[in-house]
C-alpha cells in the first residue's frame, strides 16, 4: 500500500482515459476495467478498495489477538526488551487500525466516496476540511508505521543473527 500510495500521487490529474492498466507500468500484470478512466483514478480506486479490505482484516486480527493468548516472551529477553516489544506491538496494532480508518474518513470527506472494487460502498460528503485533515493523519500515520516496521524488522534480525534466541521461531507457526 505504501508503494501504491506513493505511485498514485505522482500520476498527473486528468490523464488520458483508458480501460487497461499495466500495474506500475512493469509489464507484470494488467487490469482491465469495464469503463474508461484515468490511470490516477484507477490507482486511487484500487488503493481505496485494498485499504477497506485491509481495515476489515485488521479488525479480524485484533479480534483474534484479543481472544487468543500470544506465546510467552522468551526468558532470555531483558525487562527492557519485553517492554519495548510490547509497546512496539501495541503501536503496530494501533497504526494498522488508524491508517485505513483515516483513509476511509478522508475518502468520505471527498466528493467521490469509496467504491469497493467497483461496488459503491460509502458515499462522499464533499467536505474539504474533513478530507484535508484526515489526509494529513493518513500520511503521518503511514510514515510512523513504516518507521515502526523498520524498527520491528531490525529487532527481529538482531534476535536472529546476534542473540540467536529463537524469537523468529516464536513469531512463526511453531509451538
Residue ranges with predicted function:
Residues 1-175:
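Membrane-embedded alpha-helical bundles that constitute the cytochrome b-like, heme-associated redox core
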Amino acid at each position: 500500500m505504501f508503494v501504491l500510495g506513493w505511485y498514485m500521487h505522482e500520476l498527473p490529474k486528468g490523464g488520458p482515459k483508458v480501460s487497461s492498466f499495466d500495474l506500475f507500468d512493469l509489464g507484470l500484470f494488467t487490469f482491465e476495467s469495464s469503463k474508461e478512466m484515468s490511470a490516477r483514478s484507477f490507482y486511487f480506486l484500487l488503493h481505496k478498495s485494498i485499504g477497506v479490505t485491509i481495515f476489515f482484516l485488521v479488525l479480524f486480527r485484533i479480534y483474534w489477538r484479543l481472544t487468543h493468548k500470544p506465546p510467552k516472551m522468551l526468558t532470555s529477553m531483558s525487562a527492557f526488551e519485553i517492554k519495548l516489544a510490547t509497546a512496539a506491538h501495541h503501536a503496530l496494532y494501533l497504526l494498522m487500525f488508524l491508517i485505513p480508518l483515516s483513509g476511509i474518513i478522508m475518502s468520505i470527506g471527498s466528493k467521490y466516496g469509496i467504491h469497493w472494487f467497483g461496488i459503491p460502498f460509502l458515499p462522499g460528503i464533499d467536505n474539504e476540511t474533513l478530507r484535508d485533515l484526515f489526509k494529513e493523519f493518513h500520511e503521518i500515520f503511514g510514515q510512523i508505521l513504516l518507521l515502526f516496521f523498520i524498527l520491528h524488522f531490525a529487532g527481529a534480525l538482531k534476535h536472529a543473527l546476534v542473540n540467536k534466541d529463537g524469537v523468529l521461531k516464536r513469531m512463526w507457526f511453531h509451538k
